[in-house]
Amino acid sequence: MVALISKKRKLVADGVFYAELNEFFTRELAEEGYSGVEVRVTPTKTEVIIRATRTQDVLGENGRRINELTLLVQKRFKYAPGTIVLYAERVQDRGLSAVAQAESMKFKLLNGLAIRRAAYGVVRYVMESGAKGCEVVVSGKLRAARAKAMKFADGFLIHSGQPVNDFIDTATRHVLMRQGVLGIKVKIMRDPAKSRTGPKALPDAVTIIEPKEEEPILAPSVKDYRPAEETEAQAEPVEA
């Protein structure tokens, strides 16, 4: 017997499932450049698409790693064998993925690169990838004993309204350094004109169309805008 569930409970259950999956993959696939997950439910099975920069490492040798992840997810969420399938998909625009850049920044700092150099490297790479704007914020005990935040930004970036949801991609990561935990926040604004889905321009964008060139008027003239039939009927002489 199929258990009936209300719409509200279904939405909450789907949200919890997605959040748990995302957190699990964030921990497990950090080194593989994990940048998001998508869940597609079909009548026969549930498809989980893992987006990462290094898909070969996610798959593993002869698909061993992806099979291990499938078994873990299947056991945790009590799916029947064969009803949940995991796929790995390469991130198309790595420079426009905030999660991928936050992970990149994290590993740069762990490898001992200076904060300024790492942040400017990320900002430059994002802007070269065709972003409209980028902002990287690093906060924590950066040099002195007192915590502070450093902000690195370039281009055009909006901070409020519905366009933030449409065009801004945000990611937050934490990195454990010798002096303490540092917080990394990356915001990337995609070019609205290149957006595949949703609005193609900002709400306040105004496009000014250049007027067409008109022929110069050499002499005054009268243009008749009446229909041709009416003009012909008026032109015909009336017989007595």
From Swiss-Prot:
Pfam families: KH_2, Ribosomal_S3_C. Ubiquitinated at Lys-212 in response to stalled ribosomes. Ubiquitination leads to activation of the No-Go Decay (NGD) pathway and degradation of non-functional 18S rRNA: first monoubiquitinated at Lys-212 by MAG2, followed by formation of 'Lys-63'-linked polyubiquitin chains on monoubiquitin by HEL2 and RSP5. It is found in: Cytoplasm. Coiled coil: none annotated. Residues 230-240 have a biased composition (Acidic residues). InterPro entries: KH_dom-like_a/b, KH_dom_type_2, KH_sf_prok-type, Ribosomal_S3_C_sf, Ribosomal_uS3_C, Ribosomal_uS3_CS, Ribosomal_uS3_euk/arc. The keyword Ribosomal protein applies. There is a cross-link at residues 106, 132, 141, 151, 200, 212 (Glycyl lysine isopeptide (Lys-Gly) (interchain with G-Cter in ubiquitin)). It comes from the Eukaryota. Component of the small ribosomal subunit (SSU). Mature yeast ribosomes consist of a small (40S) and a large (60S) subunit. The 40S small subunit contains 1 molecule of ribosomal RNA (18S rRNA) and 33 different proteins (encoded by 57 genes). The large 60S subunit contains 3 rRNA molecules (25S, 5.8S and 5S rRNA) and 46 different proteins (encoded by 81 genes). Present with 146000 molecules/cell in log phase SD medium. This is Small ribosomal subunit protein uS3. It comes from Saccharomyces cerevisiae (strain ATCC 204508 / S288c) (Baker's yeast). The gene is RPS3.
